Structures are given as structure tokens and as C-alpha cells.
Design a protein with these regions (language model features):
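Intrinsically disordered, low-complexity linker/terminal regions across diverse proteins
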Residues: 2, 6-10, 14-332
């Protein structure tokens, strides 16, 4: 019943959800974080040693053109034309389906409305859409453990900050990079830069292919490449934005953990979980995301700031030699 109402009246339900759980102050804070991460990603693109100036310029144009959607739509959908009656479940579903089809048909021969959302506000998820070059963060993901307006920057940048950076990085991953700033399927990379990107991406594929997720079963580095690149970029970009924020608002050690350590702990906390062996096998075959455990244990060994935060050495089990680490978004800027 809930899924039916959610499907037929998604934004009407979303409007009630937002009124109860997502104050305007949270949206303002999120807008600032997104701006900070856009700046950090722009700085990182500018300082990449392997990318040419021509491709960098196009990448910056695409980044600047991002459409940002946070919390809920600026204008709520009008459901006044949908009649809900106390006659039968089937009749209400039929009327809602007709209403939805007519809503879509009304768009025929009209320009694409880029203000519309591809997710309802009550959805715990986020997305990047390459055909519209937009990033979207519904109100429901802007709750703990992802976002807490009462928490400090270490927690929020480590959790929702990485999600923001993750979605932004999708615009430049193995699939997103094939679209230009206007969402057109167009190659804007030089041939040499594309080759360098693919070489670096292959390091990621090989690393995840080597991970044994269950006895005799390995992760699929090719299937999960885009999401792994996005996690890799999201961590680096969010950490850079976090360190920049601390220049004007320094944080203290809490419960024995430095701000930098708490950033990475917040990230790990988001993906903490436990699933059955059968689900591990199913997700490994079908899901383009790595398993939660490996979104942490597979991503952090390629982040230099994580090594520095926890004093990781070659004697630690998660240590990966520098020449074996992924370096797609490795910047010349030292944080």
C-alpha cells in the first residue's frame, strides 16, 4: 500500500516528508557544502598532471554547468487533476496510471523541463544524470548517518560530503565523461587524455578483481568501475573541501580521534552493515556498486590522506604500495 501511494503521489508524499523532516536551514547548509566541493573538484582538475589543458578547460565548463538539486523541487507537482475515490484499490490505481500517462504525453514536442526531479524527496539515494548534467540529493538522504545539521564538519564531510563528491565525479567517470556539459553524447577528451584515463582506470579494475568477497568468488572490477571511480574521487574531493573548511573553523580531537580520523570514520560508518553469503553472491553478480565493506576497505588504501590520518605503514594489512595505488584524481596539491 505504501509503495502504491509513493508511486502515484510521490511529490505529494514528499511535500509532507519535507515539512516534517527537512528544515530550510539544512538546505542552506547543503548548498554551501556543494559549492565547497565544486570548488575543490575544480582545483583538483586544474592540478592534474596527466590531463591536457584542452581537456581540463572542457571539464571545468562541465563542472560549472552542473544543475544542483537539493532536498525537494522548487515547484511542487500539481495533483489536482487526479481523482482519488473511496471506491476500490484497482480503480484508484487505474486512474493514477491514466493521470501519469497523460502527464508524460503532455510533454511531447516540448523542450525538456530540467527543473523536474528523477527521484522523490523521500527517497534515500542520490544521483548524477549525464543527459541533463545534474546532481540530485533528496531530503531523505540528508538525514543521519549521511547528514546531521548538529554534527561538525568532520562527520558531515566524511559522510554526505563524500556522497556529493561521488555524484560529481560521476560526471567524469568511465561513462559520464562521454557526455558534454549540455548532456549530449559527445567526446570532448583528447585521444591522449582518454588513453591516460583508461590506463589509470584499469589499475582500479585490476585491484577490485583481486578482492575475494567470498571463498573462491572475486569482485567484478569492470562492472563496478564507474562507482569505484566515483567513491575514489568523492573521498579525495570531500577531504580537500573539509581541510579548506577547517582553515576558518578548526576542529578539536573528540574521544581521542582527530578531525581527519573522524572524517574517515564517518565515511566507514555510512557503509557499515552485514549481509548473508547468498546476498554477497547476488550483489557481486548484479550490482554496479561494490559491496559496502569494499567501498571502505577497497577505497581507502588508495587515499594518501587516510594513510597520514591513521599512520598506516607497510606493516598494516590494508597497506598498498604507492606505485600500486589508483591515481585518477591524484592532485599536485598537498592537503
Amino acid at each position: 500500500a505504501l509503495s502504491t501511494v509513493n508511486g502515484a503521489l510521490s511529490e505529494a508524499v514528499g511535500q509532507m516528508y519535507v515539512a516534517k523532516y527537512f528544515p530550510a536551514s539544512s538546505k542552506e547548509k547543503m548548498l554551501k557544502m556543494v559549492g565547497d566541493l565544486q570548488k575543490a573538484l575544480g582545483d583538483r582538475i586544474s592540478s592534474l598532471e596527466w590531463m591536457s589543458d584542452a581537456t581540463k578547460a572542457k571539464a571545468q565548463e562541465k563542472l560549472a554547468a552542473f544543475i544542483v538539486k537539493i532536498g525537494y523541487p522548487d515547484t511542487w507537482r500539481d495533483y489536482s487533476g487526479l481523482e482519488i475515490k473511496n471506491d476500490s484499490y484497482w480503480a484508484n490505481v487505474r486512474r493514477s496510471n491514466i493521470f501519469e500517462v497523460n502527464y508524460m504525453l503532455a510533454d511531447v514536442d516540448k523542450p525538456v523541463d530540467k527543473t523536474r526531479w528523477g527521484m522523490s524527496p523521500q527517497t534515500v539515494n542520490a544521483y548524477y544524470n549525464p543527459t541533463t548534467n545534474e546532481i540530485c540529493f533528496p531530503a531523505a538522504i540528508l538525514q543521519p548517518p549521511f547528514f546531521n545539521p548538529e554534527a561538525d564538519d568532520a562527520v558531515n564531510y566524511g559522510a554526505i560530503g563524500v556522497v556529493i563528491g561521488h555524484e560529481m565525479t560521476h560526471g567524469f567517470d568511465d561513462q559520464g565523461r562521454q557526455y558534454d556539459k549540455d548532456g549530449n553524447l559527445k567526446d570532448w577528451w583528447t585521444e591522449e587524455d582518454a588513453k591516460k584515463f583508461e590506463e589509470r582506470a584499469q589499475v582500479m579494475v585490476n585491484f577490485f578483481d583481486s578482492i575475494e568477497v567470498a571463498p573462491g568468488v572475486h569482485a567484478n572490477g569492470e562492472l563496478t568501475l564507474g562507482e569505484n571511480i566515483a567513491d575514489h574521487g568523492g573521498l579525495q574531493v570531500s577531504f580537500a573541501a573539509f581541510k579548506k573548511a577547517m582553515e576558518t573553523a578548526p576542529l578539536e580531537v573528540v574521544d581521542g580521534f582527530t578531525p581527519e580520523q573522524r572524517f574517515f570514520l564517518a565515511y566507514a560508518n555510512v557503509w557499515a552493515g552485514h549481509i548473508r553469503p547468498e546476498e554477497i553472491l547476488r550483489l557481486t553478480k548484479l550490482d554496479p556498486h561494490s559491496l559496502g565493506k569494499w567501498r571502505v576497505d577497497g577505497a581507502l588504501p588508495h587515499i594518501q590522506n587516510w594513510y597520514e590520518a591513521f599512520n598506516i605503514t607497510e606493516h598494516d594489512p590494508m597497506f598498498v604500495a604507492k606505485d600500486k595505488r589508483v591515481s585518477i584524481w591524484l592532485s599536485l596539491i598537498h592537503i
